[in-house]
């Protein structure tokens, strides 16, 4: 999947993956992670998610990474914020208050960029990527984040043969294969969310589960 795919989706406002509210799983499960106030939180492939502002509102410093500049600009405009813009290595960094959005390729992130990230939040990153890129994404995430990092991972699980992604199906077995060697994993919630999801219903899916995992990186 090429960068141009996502650039075009944002240019055409084909962003059905964007939620117009804070993710309910974030609201329910984040407080139980006991992430310290002031901790920096990495949010890969963040789009213009309202979750970014919510995390900042909890007293966290937020580091979002997003390929599409339009998504980054839209976030600050919709939040009524005027960001400072600076260049940092391969990234154009937009900063306002407690939120920094790094516009560029996630795979260009280095360990020193995220050395103080004590937490991770992935709602729409892993499931946005095809299989070969998911393996690379998980490996890169593991390589750059510090030990004792904790966070939430939210996936979709359905029969991939019935529908092309994105969003892609990511099974529990795949999550275990990507993360179990370096992270402690705990399934916090599994919900059947097929009802009302017209995009999936029209593909005649029989089941569609959202799954929430807690991740704790081993030191």
From Swiss-Prot:
Where does this protein hold S-adenosyl-L-methionine?
Answer: 10, 45, 66, 123
A GO molecular function assigned to this protein is: thiopurine S-methyltransferase activity
Q: Which GO terms describe its biological process?
A: methylation; response to metal ion
Recorded GO CC terms: cytoplasm
Q: What SUPFAM superfamilies is this protein classified in?
A: S-adenosyl-L-methionine-dependent methyltransferases (SSF53335)
The protein's UniProt keywords, in alphabetical order, are:
Cytoplasm, Methyltransferase, S-adenosyl-L-methionine, Transferase
Keyword set includes Transferase: yes
The broad enzyme category this protein falls into is transferase
What's the catalysed reaction?
S-adenosyl-L-methionine + a thiopurine = S-adenosyl-L-homocysteine + a thiopurine S-methylether
* Presence of the UniProt keyword Phosphoprotein in the record: no
Q: Where in the cell is it found?
A: Cytoplasm
- The catalytic activity of this protein is classed by the Enzyme Commission as 2.1.1.67
Q: Which family does it belong to?
A: Belongs to the class I-like SAM-binding methyltransferase superfamily. TPMT family.
The protein's name: Thiopurine S-methyltransferase
User: What does UniProt list as this organism's lineage?
Assistant: Bacteria, Pseudomonadati, Pseudomonadota, Gammaproteobacteria, Pseudomonadales
| Gene this chain is encoded by | tpm
């Amino acid at each position: 999947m090429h960068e141009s795919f996502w650039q075009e989706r944002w240019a055409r406002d084909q962003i059905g993956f964007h939620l117009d509210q804070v993710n309910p799983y974030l609201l329910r499960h984040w407080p139980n992670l006991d992430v310290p106030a002031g901790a920096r939180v990495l949010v890969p492939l963040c789009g213009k998610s309202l979750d970014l502002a919510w995390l900042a509102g909890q007293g966290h410093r937020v580091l979002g990474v997003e390929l599409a500049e339009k998504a980054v600009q839209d976030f600050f405009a919709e939040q009524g914020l005027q960001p400072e813009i600076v260049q940092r290595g391969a990234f154009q960094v937009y900063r306002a208050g407690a939120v920094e959005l790094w516009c560029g390729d996630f795979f260009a992130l280095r360990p020193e960029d995220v050395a103080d990230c004590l937490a991770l939040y992935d709602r729409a990153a892993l499931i946005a990527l095809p299989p070969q890129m998911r393996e690379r994404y998980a490996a890169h995430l593991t390589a750059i984040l510090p030990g004792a990092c904790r966070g939430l991972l939210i996936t979709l699980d359905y029969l991939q043969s019935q529908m092309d992604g994105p969003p892609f199906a990511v099974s529990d077995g795949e999550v275990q294969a990507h993360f179990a060697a370096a992270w402690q994993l705990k399934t916090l919630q599994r919900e059947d969310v097929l009802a009302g999801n017209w995009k999936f219903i029209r593909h005649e899916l029989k089941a569609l589960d959202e799954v929430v995992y807690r991740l704790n990186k081993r030191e």
